[in-house]
Amino acid sequence: MKLILTLLVSGLCALAAPAAKRDGVEDYAIGIDKRNSVEDYAIGIDKRNSVEDYAIGIDKRNSVEDYAIGIDKRNSVEDYAIGIDKRNTVEDYAIGIDKRNSVEDYAIGIDKRNTVEDYAIGIDKRNSVEDYAIGIDKRNSVEDYAIGIDKRGGSVEDYAIGIDKRNSVEDYAIGIDKRNSVEDYAIGIDKRGSVEDYAIGIDKKRGTVEDYAIGIDKRGGSVEDYAIGIDKRHGGH
């Protein structure tokens, strides 16, 4: 999990994203929505030396970690956590916890290292092993290398939120929803040679190519370099 996150964070850019000002307050920001204030509703802050050091997504609505969506404090209780929602209890509704031996009930991101779901990138065990799982890597099964499977609809990739088949049309895709067409509401396409090269989230149905894009990395060294999360619903920022 840490390797996947590291790869995503280290090389991704956003198209028409809020500026990552390299030397400014949002330096190394991983997706910022500046609707009302600097960090207001921010969805990704890495300040390297602050309280949220190595944070992968902070929502500072009421307190420092209040409703945080990604904290890695390395030595704290949430060590290795990939997303914490502290609404009522420490792990309450956690969106990614690796406690190695504790109860991961309702967790949407588990690394059990030696269990059946080894290498799983998100498990919800509410009713069965893979029931509504949002991330399975079984290495030798049909969903090999899958980065998110939801089997609710009845078919293998039905409403899948992440498929990597290496040789198919969605080669290297980081999130596919095949409801009506190949890229229909896709949440992450990387075709390596197209306009969306290295894209981490494209929704091509609303009217324009980048409309509602959730992260574009064109590696061209633009101002928004390394941004990972854009919502252009209201014309950008």
UniProtKB/Swiss-Prot annotation:
Per the UniProt record, the source organism is Aspergillus flavus (strain ATCC 200026 / FGSC A1120 / IAM 13836 / NRRL 3357 / JCM 12722 / SRRC 167)
Function of the molecule = Ribosomally synthesized cyclic peptide ustiloxin B precursor: Part of the gene cluster that mediates the biosynthesis of the secondary metabolite ustiloxin B, an antimitotic tetrapeptide. The ustA translated product contains a 16-fold repeated peptide embedding the tetrapeptide Tyr-Ala-Ile-Gly, that is converted into the cyclic moiety of ustiloxin B.
Free-text description of this protein's post-translational modifications in UniProt: UstA is processed by the subtilisin-like endoprotease kex2 that is outside the ustiloxin B gene cluster, at the C-terminal side of Arg-Lys, after transfer to Golgi apparatus through the endoplasmic reticulum (ER). Cleavage by kex2 generates 16 peptides YAIG-I to YAIG-XVI. To process the precursor peptide further, at least two peptidases are necessary to cleave the N-terminal and C-terminal sides of the Tyr-Ala-Ile-Gly core peptide which serves as backbone for the synthesis of ustiloxin B, through cyclization and modification of the tyrosine.
Per UniProt, the keywords (alphabetical) are: Signal
How is loss of this gene reflected in the phenotype of the organism? Impairs the production of ustiloxin B and its intermediate ustiloxin F.
Where, if anywhere, are coiled coils annotated?
A: none
Pro-region residues? 20-22, 234-237
Supply the name of the protein: Ribosomally synthesized cyclic peptide ustiloxin B precursosr
* Pathway as given in its UniProt record: Mycotoxin biosynthesis
Q: Which residues form the signal peptide?
A: 1-19
